[in-house]
Amino acid sequence: MNTRLIAIVLGLTTITAQAQKPAIPRDAALEAKVEKKLAKMTLDEKIGQMLELNLDVMGKMTVENAKVDREKVRSVLQQYGRSDAEVKATLKMTDQEIIDKLGGFPVDIYQGDTKRLWKLNETMLDTLISKWKVGSILNAPGTRAPSVDQWLQWIGLIQEKSMKYLGIPDIYGLDHNHGVTYTQGGTLFPQPINMGATFNTELVKRGAEITAYESRAANCPWVYNPVVDLSRDPRWARVYESFGEDAIVNSKMVVAEIKGYQGDDPNHIDRFRVGTSTKHYFAYGAPWTGKDRTPAYLSPQMIREKYFEPFKQAALAGTLTMMVNSSSINGVPVHASYEYLTKWLKEDLQWDGFLVTDWADINNLFSREKVAKDKKDAIRIAINAGIDMSMDPYSVEFCILLKELVEEGKVPMSRIDDAVRRILRAKYRLGLFDEPNTGGKGFEKFGCDEFAAASLKAAEESEVLLKNEGNILPLAKGKKILLTGPNANQMRCLHGGWSYTWQGSKAEDLSEKYNTIYEALCNKYGRENIILE
């Protein structure tokens, strides 16, 4: 009797698995192209597709008219927790010594008339693509927003080299996660926490459409968005990056945003749309300590019903890729979890997109989590668990070590082929083989008034009135208004992170035509009526 019952249960499980339709319906012609390309690739070419490098390694930041601002140096060092002794010693250095020490980092240590210019090293780029077969590049140089023309030049050259040496286009990725945050002159939208507060999926979809258009205007086909980390702990520094704490809201918003970014057919994404990388799969927004990239401890029910659900909906909506949680869930690093990466996502949902790590996260399996003895062992664990692409920003060591693992039989060739098949599929779906570059003609609406109006509407609908004692709002003209607080006259607080620079630290320089809260109140009520303290 028990044997028969087990057999029936197993049979039902098999039938259920077989009945699960692919999250993205397969296109036979596209799949044939993927298989044909895959069959012609060498092991080196396949492994190169699985590596994503930071653009900074292909160029150099030069400084003209360099003059160090020592108060900025002091502030930067204190911000990053350096000791008083190190701060004191650094301030005694010459300007050039300070530049040599700190100039390579995305921090502002210069006086106002200093110019920082990033130059692409074509020889280095040539080597990385011709020798190491690198298939993906990311980021803005120095994490500071370039112009559209600069993006067209740099990504255009990357695609030229990729097609010349590999016959496979690069898939370039940027954190364009509340508008084109890494492109000057484009449209910034309110942060996702604001977009969630609108409860308006049409606004979210329209914002994604505009961001996709302006990303492609800058020749970028892939964005690291949407973010659907349930933000349930106000201590967590990245609450603003998601749609909030509710699984239903995040699920509804992520579907709308994916449709806006990618269009209605994920197999055929047109030149005005981009591929999405829904992140951070999953439970990244539930750190036990409240600090970023720290462990989550959750019940199985909470994991399945709440934290997994928005990602399930993203997969079913056709997101091309997902970025993985940097930390661990109940003691298991997500980058090492076959159950989470392969079974739940790729097998149970029949999702055929690819999984990319976050910044250098495979390294954490040995350096922080201690589940691997060294980097090579960490690569073995992560790739076998289901990671398809490693964001290993500064080194090609990944390629060397993964090849050794394949030759030693520790990573099966079938796993390599599966990963590369998924990456090629995404590139075909984006139309990159037919049109590696976009931008220029057809993208004249970049940064237009229509797009700005859509952003303003989203900002207005996101406003939540918490208190209005004595009906003081709306403010009457002709009265004195006290405005106080550290953010009252700063632009950075209005944008938040991922705004022109990684932490939004250069927002003042790149948003001069806009107003701070103080400036806006002065314009409306008269400077003589505003008291700033």
Question: Model segments located where?
Answer:
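Glycoside hydrolase catalytic-domain context in secreted enzymes
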Residues: 18-533
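Bacterial Sec-dependent N-terminal signal peptides
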Residues: 1-23
